Amino acid sequence: MHDKTWSGRFNEPVSELVKQYTASIGFDRRLAEWDIQGSLAHAQMLKETGVLDEGDLADIRRGMAEILEEIRSGKIEWSSDLEDVHMNIERRLTDKIGDAGKRLHTGRSRNDQVATDIRLWLRDQITVIQSLIQSLQTALLDLAEQNAETVMPGFTHLQVAQPVSFGHHMLAYVEMLGRDNERMADCRCRVNRMPLGAAALAGTTYPIQREITAELLGFEQICQNSLDAVSDRDFAIEFTAAASLVMVHLSRLSEELILWMSPRFGFIDIADRFCTGSSIMPQKKNPDVPELVRGKSGRVIGHLIGLITLMKSQPLAYNKDNQEDKEPLFDTADTLIDTLRIYADMMRGVTVKPDNMRAAVMQGFATATDLADYLVKKGMPFRDAHEVVAQAVRHADQAGVDLSELPLEVLQGFSDLIADDVYGVLTPEGSLNARNHLGGTAPEQVRFQVKRWREMLA
């Protein structure tokens, strides 16, 4: 007798090598609890449509409850001979309750079953991810609020550009994460569509009522085409794309944390619990966590490319290729969840060094644009003002001082429009306060945005 439920068609058993190569139980068993959820809803629907009787349903519920306990306690024995999580659970159920377990699969295929399991699992992961994104946003908001008036150099091309508030810089990532959360919510809408009832590819001849199952499982919509329902994994690709963007944003922040922690910048310090030392260099304190986040972003992006490549040449409907969707999908969710959890804690352990930040502003002529704007407001065309300020910067650079440190008579040598009120715009703090408009870096605007975001996240 063959172990396979489909073995009646074949003249010889599957080879051991093929069993090992094709079995997915090693990784898809993490879907077990969601598989049981789907089966219980399917059984309830079969009972309400007259396919199962009350006794069958009671036996299935009892058996599944026992199996769920075995899974949670680690007592269940998974068999690669049974290929996957679905057949392992079905065999265990049949061993426990007999023929009622064999009737459970009526009107269903593993094709729509696994698609349902993945969507149920992914829906829950997205809920966790959205909560973790908001937790990280809150940690960044705390930093932003504490540092609304902390001035630092803003960069373009990694060259000092203009003064910005450190709080404003943190708010930039709050905004990015906000869009990430919107993408996750939008993705969840398409994940939350039920394929169950599509059967293998063409539907079923049994009098099923998919609306019953969808309501029991909390699906907002039902997949309307059986071929599409079992064969596409665009929802998994979409999730991985959204996850990739979160990781890209965290990778960018990680790069900045790494730079800012280095002695050449000295803008911040990261708590010791997120760093490691060197086996040979006693003085080292390495920012391993942000470095690893930067590295893991490539891992998630790689999963996105892998899933797209997996789907690109498959004809309808289901193909065994789709077994390869789970490991990258699982790892993407795991990596993102772990990263978000550690990142929020790490940002709460960041120590800001305002004096070093301000000193860096003073070394890069960060208020040059403010001087140009000052001249424009006095009536000089902007292009002329740009040239005048460039000459002043060159002079200050040669003298080894900041623009704000040039004497008034020297500044007036570049333009007679310059008066003693110029120093009000040449200080970093003056530059910040001058940009007091929606989206600007002024401390007042930073506090406004912090308040707005706290209300949105409440």
From Swiss-Prot:
Pfam families: ASL_C2, Lyase_1. Pathway: Amino-acid biosynthesis; L-arginine biosynthesis; L-arginine from L-ornithine and carbamoyl phosphate: step 3/3. The keyword DNA-binding does not apply. It is an enzyme of class 4 (lyase). PROSITE patterns: FUMARATE_LYASES. Gene3D superfamilies: Fumarase/aspartase (C-terminal domain), Fumarase/aspartase (Central domain), Fumarase/aspartase (N-terminal domain). InterPro entries: Arg_succ_lyase_C, Argininosuccinate_lyase, Fumarase/histidase_N, Fumarate_lyase_CS, Fumarate_lyase_fam, Fumarate_lyase_N, L-Aspartase-like. The keyword RNA-binding does not apply. Its EC number is 4.3.2.1. It catalyses: 2-(N(omega)-L-arginino)succinate = fumarate + L-arginine. One of its GO terms (cellular component) is cytosol. It comes from the Bacteria. Its main location: cytoplasm. Keywords: Amino-acid biosynthesis, Arginine biosynthesis, Cytoplasm, Lyase. One of its GO terms (biological process) is L-arginine biosynthetic process. It is found in: Cytoplasm. GO terms for molecular function: argininosuccinate lyase activity. Belongs to the lyase 1 family. Argininosuccinate lyase subfamily. HAMAP family: Arg_succ_lyase. This is Argininosuccinate lyase. It comes from Neisseria meningitidis serogroup B (strain ATCC BAA-335 / MC58). The lineage of its organism: Bacteria, Pseudomonadati, Pseudomonadota, Betaproteobacteria, Neisseriales. The gene is argH.
